[in-house]
Each structure stands twice: as C-alpha cells, then as structure tokens.
Amino acid sequence: MVNRNASASAFGWDFQANAALVLMLDNIENAESIRVEGNEDIEIFLNDQRKIYAQAKSVMKADDYSNVNRNLIGALETLNDDSRKEDGDRFTYVTNSPNPFNNQTTMSYFYGNTHLLYDELPDVARRKIVDLITKNSFTKIDLEKFDVRIIPFIGEDLKNR
C-alpha cells in the first residue's frame, strides 16, 4: 500500500522556510532578497550580486540517522552544481540532525544551533566530505566556501522549532 501521509514533506518544507529565515537574518547586513524553493532550496541574493546557496535537509526525529548520508550526498551534489554558476559567496548545508555525518564521535560538535566552516569541522567529517566529493565527482565545489549549519527543529511543539 502506498503511503500518502504528507507529514514528512510538510515538516521538510516547514524546516526549509525556517532555515531560510535564520540564514537571512544571519546575513541581513549584506542581503538584498531571498528565494525559497525556487531553483534551489534557499538562495540569498547579496548586495554585491553574489549569492549564498543553501541546501536544507531535515529529519523528523533527532535520533533517526537513516537518511543523513543520503541527505549529505544530495546536498553536496546540488551545491556542486551551484558552484558551476560562479556567483556563489557561500555554499551551505543546513540540517536539523545532531548527527549530520552519521558518526557518533562527531555529535558533540553539532548539538544546538551550530555554524561551522569546512576547516572547523572535525577531521572525520572533513574526510567524509572529501571522500564523497571524490567518489561522486563533485569537482566544482569550493570547500573554502562550504559551511554546515545545524538548526534545532524537532517535534510538534513550536517551542522546539
């Protein structure tokens, strides 16, 4: 039987909209406008004609790590495509998972509202990114412009969103 429950999709859209607001507010001094679910999940248009490209990937349960690898690969693929446009100021992977690299040893880096540049990520996370980039031929993404954002967003209680 086909599952027609749209709650996971609605949750993902809600997370994406909230992530867009957080990213926009973080860049308010340099931002002109924002587009959500246009060509990309999130695009922030900056005053200097450059853009912040962000891929928002959510999990409905904080302890569900079954899709984090697939989410990371999908985000890297799209951000790699965005890098070809040559107008990117930043390429952001934003998620609500406290375990975005599916590695228990790195979880302490990702609890709460977290923003880490590529160079600030734990070694095992950086190696995983490089391995995925190499394995999937994502050759355009500039890791000096790559960052990871964790935005807590779990459950039905709006205080947790």
Predicted feature residues:
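Acidic metal-coordinating catalytic centers involved in nucleic-acid phosphodiester chemistry
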Residues: 1-7, 58-161
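Catalytic centers of nucleases
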Residues: 5, 9-78
